[in-house]
Regions:
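N-terminal Rossmann-like FAD-binding beta1-loop-alpha1 element of flavoenzymes
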Residues: 28-53
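Glycine-rich FAD pyrophosphate-binding loop
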Residues: 46-66
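Glycine-rich active-site loop/strand segments that organize a redox cofactor
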Residues: 66-97
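Active-site substrate-recognition segment that forms the wall
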Residues: 103, 111-119, 206-208, 224-264, ...
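Helical element adjacent to the flavin cofactor pocket in flavoenzyme catalytic cores
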Residues: 142, 166-228
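C-terminal catalytic lobe of FAD-dependent flavoproteins
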Residues: 304-310, 314-422
Length: 425
């Protein structure tokens, strides 16, 4: 029987603690109890600030516990394209911060003793076209030259050492990328926050933020509170309560499926090194073995619709998986689920302040790494820490033209990307 909730929830069900009364005031109010909001809350509480976190759902029920569990910290543009478009200084700054963010997440998990199956196994990125392989090989050379990441290209003749598939024309391995269990990671972060004195109000949607002389009034479905500072951390689940941010983020459905248990010999063939996996499609597939090595977890952004309702988009995703792994043609699915990632015009994470409200958003599908990193950076900004600099602050954060939060254009964009992928353009 197929279950329509994330596979990750089997090991880490979403918490549903009793609601507590809203405090009349606090130092900082945070909207969003995912990785981003809780990372900020932990930093602020440890600095002695009183913090209330509000979420319209259960804590971590949205993207934080629905992802593929691939800790890449990738940016949408390759380093080669960034060099060409932005120049060496900016390109290196963006990519270097990604390296720092990955290391920060690893240190945090170890320091807090979070048991989330964190495993730095690396990631193989498959080249969908021969020309893509040449680009990946060049990318590996550039990453090693500028950052010494030990990335390497894998020709098609040797790719079975990395993946049991003939769907690709070689690829690249990034050994600096880890896998983890995202719901367990969130549970560990939530425990840190609660243990540090943070108050989390789940199922408490924020309806508006009003600036006042001495701070802000935050309106919720359960009452009002006053805060000296406000941090918005909803990312792909941003709603009408924060219209300025909503006009700058496009929520894109990202789908995932989990296979039934597989024979160990099949797993050894398909994922011989148990790496994280991806490819070079514009509508790229991301997939991996489960942490216990018993299943394939497969994701993609091919819905082409504003909401996911019914089996059609999952059937398409299932067919994509079988195209890569024909061995799975007769294997059943144990779980199917979906969530939103947040895209923006520049395809870069953003750390911003507007009218006194702090924002971190636009992780473009790589939130496991960027959410904690920029959530913490935002907290340091609130604290007035002059050393909390980031390459992702102070850059233009443009609104999407003719858009107010309803991505009416998304089906056409996805159809166009499917066309480009089909012809390798």
């Amino acid at each position: 029987m197929t279950i329509y909730t994330p596979y990750w929830w089997e090991e880490a069900p979403r918490p549903d603690p009793p609601q507590t009364a809203l405090a009349d005031d606090c130092d900082v109010a945070i909207i969003g109890a995912g990785y981003t909001g809780l990372a900020a809350a932990i930093e602020l509480a440890r600095a002695g600030r009183s913090v209330q976190v509000f979420d319209k759902s259960r804590a971590g029920e949205a993207a934080s516990s629905r992802s593929g569990g691939i800790g890449s910290g990738n940016l949408r543009l390759s380093f080669a394209k960034m060099l060409a478009r932005l120049g060496r200084q900016k390109a290196e700054a963006y990519y270097r911060e990604g390296i720092e963010a990955r290391a920060d997440l690893s240190r945090f998990i170890e320091a807090e003793g979070i048991q989330c199956h964190f495993d730095p196994v690396g990631c193989f990125i498959g080249a969908v076209r021969p020309a893509h392989y040449e680009s990946l090989a060049r990318e590996a050379e550039l990453l090693n030259k500028h950052f010494d990441l030990a990335a390497f290209s894998v020709p098609k003749s040797e790719q079975h050492k990395e993946i049991g598939s003939d769907a690709y024309h070689g690829g690249m391995v990034r050994p600096d990328i880890a896998g983890l269990q995202p719901a367990l990671l969130h549970q560990g972060i939530l425990d840190c926050a609660l243990g540090g004195g943070v108050t989390v109000h789940a199922k408490t949607a924020v309806s508006g933020i009003q600036r006042e002389a001495s701070g802000f009034e935050v309106m919720t479905v359960r009452g009002r509170t006053r805060a000296r500072d406000v941090f918005v951390a909803g990312n792909g689940y941003t709603d009408a309560a924060t219209p300025w941010l909503r006009r700058r983020l496009v929520p894109v459905p990202s789908l995932m499926i989990a296979t039934d248990h597989l024979d160990p010999a099949v797993m050894d063939k398909l994922c011989p090194k148990r790496r994280m996996l991806g490819d070079t499609n514009r509508l790229h597939n991301y997939f991996r073995p489960s942490p216990d090595g018993s299943r394939i977890l497969f994701g993609g952004r091919t819905a082409g619709r504003l909401a996911v309702d019914g089996p059609v988009p999952f059937a398409h995703l299932h067919n994509k998986m079988i195209g890569i792994f024909p061995d799975l043609a007769e294997v059943g699915l144990s779980h199917i689920w979906w969530g939103f990632v947040a895209m923006n015009i520049d395809h870069l994470p953003q750390l911003a302040v507007k009218d006194g409200v702090h924002y971190a958003a636009g992780f473009c599908g790589s939130g496991i790494v960027w959410a904690r990193w920029l959530g913490r950076k935002a907290a340091l900004k609130v604290l007035g820490d002059a050393t909390a600099v980031s390459a992702f602050e102070g850059q233009p954060f443009a609104a999407v033209p003719f858009y107010n939060g309803n991505p009416w254009f998304l089906p056409a964009v996805v159809t166009w990307f499917k066309f480009l992928d089909a012809f390798g353009l």
